[in-house]
Curated annotation (Swiss-Prot):
This is tRNA-2-methylthio-N(6)-dimethylallyladenosine synthase. Its cofactor is [4Fe-4S] cluster. Residues 7-123 form the MTTase N-terminal domain. The lineage of its organism: Bacteria, Pseudomonadati, Chlorobiota, Chlorobiia, Chlorobiales. It comes from the Bacteria. The gene is miaB. Monomer. It is an enzyme of class 2 (transferase). Keywords: 4Fe-4S, Cytoplasm, Iron, Iron-sulfur, Metal-binding, S-adenosyl-L-methionine, Transferase, tRNA processing. It comes from Chlorobium phaeovibrioides (strain DSM 265 / 1930) (Prosthecochloris vibrioformis (strain DSM 265)).
Length: 448
């Protein structure tokens, strides 16, 4: 379908890092199709909301944005509004009935269709491309990323784990991996463009399985580390059951792989983990934590936690608090449970915990974790850390902000450093969420 060449588009990205990576893919596809990037949402001929369906409040945010765009459309009759990503994949064509402002829908596997969808929308057809395509990994597309220090490189898409609370398998489809050769080609392009950090992405990144040669994630991680010796390497998100000793060795043995592992646990109760269909109990989880700490001294661990899942009792909640005290995570993403349509929990488990109890338990988790996080930061005072400078500090142009390999935010005096530099910083102060330090000098670009 033909469309008007040169129309401008703006992508409003919600949710996870994978969505940010997908927005870069969408940008490349549309630019290749003759569209151009608008400087702002107000200036755009086409606005695309790239959406997240993981939590109920994410859907509410999209609803508010669509209400705003309804007013924008009254002022600019030619404006097209598209919704991409997980929400349309979850709600299907019902979204078109719910929100008349929407002109087209695209699921996570159909972004190559966007130029044609826009062409149909210009003719008033309100098209939707929402099928799953198990072969689609967007290999061969060179994402058009925003300017910055770090680059996201997706290596898996979808998820096969079927955790009871999680909508991802129903919005992202079955798990599939990028070919090893495609990942390495993308890593080379990222290095050539001068990025200082590469984050390998997947809904369950450490289940990576190369479809061509069968390489696992540990093998891929080592190869990326060797190919990009001047880049810091991160990965997310991990599933605890797929953290292998070989993967831990790869992190421990490679100087440019960050000593930070995001290890979602969701609950400290084995009974709740079983109800959540997580595939492991708390003892196995703690064995993985012990392995990481034994092989990688100073490793930073972060996690995800859900308060008030179906059937959670006081003793289950207390087990979660006990886990926080034992593991002492650097940080955590913490939420109370909200049922998601179509999931196993929504279909088979009663949402028995009252909302007030969920909120109270969540607050107790937050309060405890914030105190632990503050203590962890305070322990860093007096140490010298390797920081990748990301940007100017919001407080002063004379300061830079960056992150350590353990993913701690650090603000320090600029000196002669610039965003993208590795900087040695002496930590002098810790607040509740940020470290402050003194610039000790720019470090060599290559890790050793």
């Amino acid at each position: 379908m033909k469309h008007e060449k040169g129309r401008s588009f703006y992508i409003h990205t919600f949710g996870c890092q994978m969505n940010q990576a997908d927005s870069a893919i969408i940008t490349a596809i549309l630019m290749d199709g003759g569209f151009r990037v608008a400087g702002s949402q107000e200036d755009a001929d086409i606005v695309i909301l790239n959406t997240c369906a993981v939590r109920e409040n994410a859907v509410e945010r999209i609803t508010h944005q669509l209400q705003f765009l309804r007013g924008a459309k009254r002022r600019k009759k030619s404006l097209l509004v598209g919704v991409a990503g997980c929400v349309p994949q979850h709600l299907k064509r019902e979204m078109l009935e719910m929100f008349p402002v929407i002109d087209f829908l695209a699921g996570p596997d159909t972004y190559r269709n966007l130029p044609a969808l826009i062409g149909d929308a210009e003719e008033g057809k309100r098209p939707a491309a929402l099928e799953f395509r198990i072969e689609e990994t967007y290999a061969g597309i060179d994402p058009l990323r925003e300017v910055g220090v770090g680059a996201f490189v997706p290596v898996t898409r979808g998820c096969n784990n079927m955790c009871a609370f999680c909508v991802v398998p129903f919005t992202r489809g079955r798990e599939r991996s990028q070919p090893f050769s495609a990942v390495m080609d993308e890593v080379r392009r990222v290095v050539e463009k001068g990025y200082g950090e590469i984050t390998l992405l997947g809904q369950n990144v450490n289940s990576y399985a190369d479809p061509e040669e069968g390489r696992d994630f540990a093998s891929l991680l080592r190869a990326v580390s060797r190919e990009a010796p001047g880049c810091r390497i991160r990965f997310t998100t991990s599933h605890p059951k797929d953290i292998s000793p070989d993967l831990v060795d790869a992190i421990a043995d490679s100087p440019n792989i960050c000593n930070h592992v995001h290890l979602p646990v969701q609950s400290g109760s084995s009974r709740m983990l079983h109800r959540m269909n997580r595939g492991h109990g708390i003892d196995e989880y703690l064995e993985t934590v012990a392995l990481l700490r034994r092989r990688i001294p100073g490793v930073s661990l972060t996690t995800d936690l859900i308060a008030g899942f179906c059937g959670e009792e006081d003793e289950d909640h207390e087990a979660t608090l006990a886990l926080l005290r034992e593991v002492r995570y650097d940080n955590a993403f913490m939420f109370y449970y909200s049922p998601r349509f179509g999931t196993a929990a929504w279909k088979t488990l009663a949402d028995t915990v009252p909302l007030a109890v969920k909120k109270q338990r969540l607050q107790e988790i937050i309060d405890l974790q914030l105190s632990i996080s503050a203590e962890c930061l305070q322990e860093a005072v007096g140490s010298v850390v390797d920081v990748l400078a990301e940007s100017e500090s919001r407080r002063s142009t004379e300061q830079l902000m960056g992150r350590t390999g353990t993913n701690r935010a650090v603000v320090f005096d600029r000196g002669g450093a610039r965003p993208g530099d590795r900087v040695s910083v002496l930590i002098s102060k810790a607040s509740s969420a940020t470290l402050t330090g003194v610039n000790q000098g720019v470090l060599p670009a290559f890790y050793s």
